[in-house]
């Protein structure tokens, strides 16, 4: 009865749990679908769209499509590393070595580039989707690099200490 006000702490790594969960699988699928959609667009309709642009627009298209594919390559690499770790194909040490080669840094958005709004709508959609995925992966990656969080498994009962003292007082009186 004297332990009513006590708490027990356990270490929980939310990022590790997330990276091995079904939610990670959904992000993985989303990332791979974005890679496929981008490749399909750039190799198909994107070629036609780029030919319809003025020279300045074609230069912006070429620049932004290269940035898009580079960003997606980095994101896909990160996802494949995490999936390999999750499935046991690679060790934690191997995953860390491979991860260090990636450059998942915060990067500027191209909306400020003069003429960005003139790019084909589909390319802009793919760029925006890649940044949304990038932001999610960077947050998860940072969380994975942080020390684990200690969380109280049982919340402290504000009255628990008083109940424990009363119980101890009555137990000692008898």
Residue ranges and their predicted role:
Residues 2-174:
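Surface-exposed peri-terminal alpha-helical interaction modules
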């Amino acid at each position: 009865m004297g332990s009513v006000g006590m708490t027990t702490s356990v270490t929980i790594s939310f990022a590790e749990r997330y990276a091995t969960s079904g939610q990670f699988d959904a992000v993985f699928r989303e990332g791979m679908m974005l890679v496929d959609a981008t490749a399909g667009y750039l190799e198909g309709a994107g070629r036609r769209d780029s030919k319809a642009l003025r020279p300045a627009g074609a230069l912006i298209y070429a620049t932004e499509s290269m940035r898009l594919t580079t960003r997606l390559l980095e994101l896909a690499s990160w996802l494949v590393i995490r999936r390999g770790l999750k499935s046991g194909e690679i060790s934690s040490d191997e995953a860390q070595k491979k991860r260090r080669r990636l450059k998942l840094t915060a990067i500027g958005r191209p909306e400020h580039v003069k003429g960005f709004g003139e790019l084909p709508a589909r390319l802009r959609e793919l760029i925006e989707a890649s940044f949304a995925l990038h932001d999610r992966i960077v947050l998860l990656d940072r969380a994975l690099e942080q020390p684990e969080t200690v969380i109280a498994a049982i919340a402290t009962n504000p009255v628990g200490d008083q109940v424990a003292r009363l119980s101890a007082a009555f137990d000692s009186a008898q």
